[in-house]
Amino acid sequence: MTSTPKPLVLIILDGFGHSDIPEHNAIFAANKPVYDRLCATQPHGLISGSGMDVGLPDGQMGNSEVGHMNLGAGRVVYQDFTRVTKAIRDGEFFENPVLTGAVDKAVGAGKAVHILGLLSDGGVHSHQDHLVAMAKLAAQRGAEKIYLHAFLDGRDTPPRSAQSSIELLDATFAKLGKGRIASLIGRYYAMDRDNRWDRVSAAYNLIVDSAAEYTADTALAGLEAAYARDESDEFVKATRIGDAVKVEDGDAVIFMNFRADRARELSRAFVEPDFTEFARARLPKMAAYIGLTQYSAKIPAPAAFAPSSLNNVLGEYLAKNGKTQLRIAETEKYAHVTFFFSGGREEPFEGEERILIPSPKVATYDLQPEMSAPEVTDRIVEAIEQQRFDVIVVNYANGDMVGHTGVFEAAVKAVEALDTCVGRIVDALEKVGGEALITADHGNVEQMEDECTGQAHTAHTTEPVPFIYVGKRNVKVREGGVLADVAPTMLKLLGLEKPVEMTGTSILVDA
């Protein structure tokens, strides 16, 4: 007969970061006797919930989706942008078999490498550093003919800001001693996603056959001429740079956008044998057409960075080991504690139950800062007393949702409501011999005013988040923890070996 579970409860205080600055800090201002007592008597510390520690670019504030994905996965979950940037830094990019294979085929036949992509530092669809790295990879592997077909931004960047990006790539090619920008066109044409095929055809014909409305000796001259025609970056018309460059049989074509939605239409024109959206004057027999990421499972093009599937996330691993689990949150954060915490899976795992508590129907949550936290807590206390679950994962939305309103007094009340709720959970756990981990997904409520502008600060922060152990074990919190370490910590408390897929390590160590 199995022993009665004494639940391990993971309490996620959404948007509840830590700052040592007391001004405009709703946590500091709140009357929170339970939280203060736990920090004084229980093992506690801080863990990171932002930037590269959660798979985002350096200095990027965390968010709820990324936070819960990392919490549940037990490993840092890298976004495509970050995966590519990290691979470039680590050197893995230059050994990527999909990229090197395409370049080597072209080089072996004495053919050209064509690089397509949004030339921008916007970081939404692409990043110019990735295009620089691709040019370097091609040169390192012996390509003599390297051509960049640059799509100009002006949408995720200022409308006329392409000059510095063009200068960067010109300097890159000069340093490599080979390669050049072969064409310019605005993203309005090359990156359509609304089936405006006349726009896409302009980009396709420019790249494949050097068919252009305008020509220029250099990319900078082409840009200046476009500005003189009153075309901002996004709308620059097809411009051939220097001698005509065509995509010939045996050439390799590599599309360096990492975001899929605006890369699909042009890619279809290059790779679909029965393409009918516009009449292609010519379809070269390319050695390879590569997407930096998978643009669509229906587009027959290899991806240099294939989609990463998350196996053995916490919920799945608990189910495999016969453990029961409860996920509970109010409406605002229900998807986070279920779908995102489960690594992008909609369906519950075996032995998993879910409780959704409706969020209050108010215009803004500063009008009801306690939100539905008391009702959520009622159900958690009930579940603890029943002792049906090995693990309970709860999200409290207050810190984030009230923090987003920018109303300081309401944020203080939200923190005080949370303190009462946490106290009720801790009391219930003590009666049954259970344990809890208290943490957050990212910061917010600890900074309610922008120190530069003096205006309300309604966004997330890059501050670390608390990590508190509640229980009887003689442990301490190690330095350097991140959100991805939380799931391995839970498995350690449950007496389970972590799966190989979880690269995080326990935050709790023997005292």
Curated annotation (Swiss-Prot):
Residues binding Mn(2+) 2: 14, 64, 441-442
The keyword Ion transport appears for this protein: no
Cofactor annotation: Mn(2+)
Entry EC no(s): 5.4.2.12
Cofactor note (record): Binds 2 manganese ions per subunit.
Source organism, top-level taxon: Bacteria
Keywords: Glycolysis, Isomerase, Manganese, Metal-binding
Cellular component, GO annotation: cytosol
Pathway, per record: Carbohydrate degradation; glycolysis; pyruvate from D-glyceraldehyde 3-phosphate: step 3/5
Similarity section: Belongs to the BPG-independent phosphoglycerate mutase family.
HAMAP family for this protein: GpmI
Functional summary from the UniProt entry: Catalyzes the interconversion of 2-phosphoglycerate and 3-phosphoglycerate.
Identification of the protein by name: 2,3-bisphosphoglycerate-independent phosphoglycerate mutase
Species this chain originates from: Pseudomonas putida (strain ATCC 700007 / DSM 6899 / JCM 31910 / BCRC 17059 / LMG 24140 / F1)
Gene expressing this chain: gpmI
